[in-house]
């Protein structure tokens, strides 16, 4: 039995990475801890995070391949060692990283003899994680030309019936960048109180690091709960319809009124850190510009001057005016 000594916070809730390694280009591992937690909280967070990590994080895959003069998926071509089916399976395994929206086109044009690998794919705005991934072996001086379709989604999608008429074949797509996630709980006694430490293990395919996956999962989870903080006031009617009560609307401003003055600035920053630019409903082009500049939250956006924003590639004066207008509308955040 292996024993580890870990220094954990006993007062303020904190998380940290206690182990990180790269087993291969397509296998990253990270182990994280979160503490201190009250009894029962670790299991709640662990189960929720595992479900989000495995099902809610987007990934990029090749979803369709097209090549002319192919009668069916299980046919072979003279001069190519693999069958068409084997080539499609190899394309399915290609790991990609991107921030694209919608569908993109890519292609392979290779003249044999030689080995076709992932580095031979012409991919606009998409990164291949492992250029050495094998696709096909051309044993004769022939041309192999394949048109590819690339998509970014979440979860997985089983291929539909192939359209044989135009030589187009759908590919089973696994969009999940997280290969696996596990959690475990360690209980300990702090004074007279029983507390817990949550251990979270994450394996990814290399398109995201475990830390990036944890960040994305946390952001997605926050987005799911944000509407509850801004729910409209509702009247609760009792069965006798004689007594009515209105639930007060919780806002960040209401909360700030009850904290000490010296904590207001910190509270405001914490709030802004939890509000992501995804929630501002920005046009895709502005959103992509901010993302490429590593601006993910409203706090990070407010920390940028107008001059900083105008230095962003493809960012225009009209975009700046639009953002300023959005922030003015959302003034309860700032």
From Swiss-Prot:
Keywords: Chloroplast, DNA-directed RNA polymerase, Nucleotidyltransferase, Plastid, Transcription, Transferase. Belongs to the RNA polymerase alpha chain family. DNA-dependent RNA polymerase catalyzes the transcription of DNA into RNA using the four ribonucleoside triphosphates as substrates. It catalyses: RNA(n) + a ribonucleoside 5'-triphosphate = RNA(n+1) + diphosphate. GO terms for biological process: DNA-templated transcription. Residues 1-232 are annotated as: Alpha N-terminal domain (alpha-NTD). It is found in: Plastid, Chloroplast. It comes from the Eukaryota. In plastids the minimal PEP RNA polymerase catalytic core is composed of four subunits: alpha, beta, beta', and beta''. When a (nuclear-encoded) sigma factor is associated with the core the holoenzyme is formed, which can initiate transcription. NCBIfam families: rpoA (TIGR02027). It comes from Pisum sativum. It holds the Pfam family RNA_pol_A_CTD. Its EC number is 2.7.7.6. GO terms for molecular function: DNA binding; DNA-directed RNA polymerase activity; protein dimerization activity. The keyword rRNA-binding does not apply. This is DNA-directed RNA polymerase subunit alpha. The N-terminal domain is essential for RNAP assembly and basal transcription, whereas the C-terminal domain is involved in interaction with transcriptional regulators and with upstream promoter elements. Gene3D superfamilies: 5' to 3' exonuclease, C-terminal subdomain, DNA-directed RNA polymerase, insert domain, RNA polymerase, RBP11-like subunit. Residues 267-334 are annotated as: Alpha C-terminal domain (alpha-CTD). The keyword Ligase does not apply. One of its GO terms (cellular component) is chloroplast. It is an enzyme of class 2 (transferase).
């Amino acid at each position: 039995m292996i024993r580890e000594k870990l220094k954990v916070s006993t007062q303020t809730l904190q998380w940290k990475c206690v182990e990180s390694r790269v087993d291969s280009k397509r296998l990253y591992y990270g182990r994280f801890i979160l503490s201190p937690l009250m009894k029962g909280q670790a299991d709640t967070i662990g189960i929720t995070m595992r479900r989000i990590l495995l099902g809610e994080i987007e990934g990029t895959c090749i979803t369709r391949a097209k090549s002319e003069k192919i009668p069916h998926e299980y046919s072979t071509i003279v001069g190519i060692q693999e069958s068409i089916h084997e080539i499609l399976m190899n394309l399915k395994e290609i790991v990609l990283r991107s921030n694209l929206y919608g569908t993109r086109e890519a292609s392979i044009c290779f003249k044999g003899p030689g080995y076709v690998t992932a580095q031979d794919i012409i991919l606009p705005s998409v990164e291949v994680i492992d250029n050495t991934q094998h696709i096909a072996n051309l044993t004769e001086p022939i041309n192999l030309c394949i048109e590819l379709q690339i998509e970014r989604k979440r979860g997985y999608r089983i291929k539909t019936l192939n359209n044989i008429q135009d030589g187009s074949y759908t590919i089973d797509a696994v969009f999940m960048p997280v290969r696996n996630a596990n959690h475990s709980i360690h209980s300990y006694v702090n004074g007279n109180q029983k507390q817990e430490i949550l251990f979270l293990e994450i394996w990814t395919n290399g398109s995201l690091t475990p830390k990036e996956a944890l960040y994305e999962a946390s952001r997605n989870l926050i987005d799911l709960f944000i509407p509850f903080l801004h729910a409209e006031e509702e009247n609760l009617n009792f069965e006798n319809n004689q007594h009515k009560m209105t639930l007060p609307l919780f806002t960040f401003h209401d909360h700030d009124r009850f904290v000490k003055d010296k904590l207001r600035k910190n509270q405001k920053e914490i709030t802004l850190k939890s509000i992501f630019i995804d929630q501002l409903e920005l046009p895709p082009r502005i959103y992509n510009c901010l993302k490429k500049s590593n601006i993910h939250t409203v706090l990070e956006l407010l920390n940028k001057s107008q001059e900083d924003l105008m230095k962003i590639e493809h960012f225009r004066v009209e975009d700046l005016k639009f953002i300023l207008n959005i922030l003015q509308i959302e003034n309860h955040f700032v």
